[in-house]
């Protein structure tokens, strides 16, 4: 590897503010914020809008999309068009 062209790979804390959840991992992300972690060391901090702790897919709080209304509207339009074409021909 060439020297001086690769970003620093270091421990970083990612915090999901919405879920009040943080985890320590390694990353090359750049940030000016820091946080004191549970082990007493200070690490760079990256604030997240969403993570597996708050995403509906991972938490099981998914919103079910009601497609029944769409299907019913489509079927009613189809029936009307069939009736119109049946009356004409």
Swiss-Prot record:
- Gene Ontology cellular-component terms listed: ribonucleoprotein complex; ribosome
Q: Respond yes or no to whether keyword Ribonucleoprotein is given for this record.
A: yes
**Which GO molecular function, any one, fits this protein according to its record?**
structural constituent of ribosome
Supply one GO BP term. Answer: translation
Q: Which InterPro entries match?
A: Ribosomal_bL28/bL31-like_sf, Ribosomal_bL31, Ribosomal_bL31_B, Ribosomal_bL31_sf
- Domain of life here? Bacteria
Q: What is this protein called?
A: Large ribosomal subunit protein bL31B
What species is given as this protein's source? Rubrobacter xylanophilus (strain DSM 9941 / JCM 11954 / NBRC 16129 / PRD-1)
Name of the gene this protein is made from: rpmE2
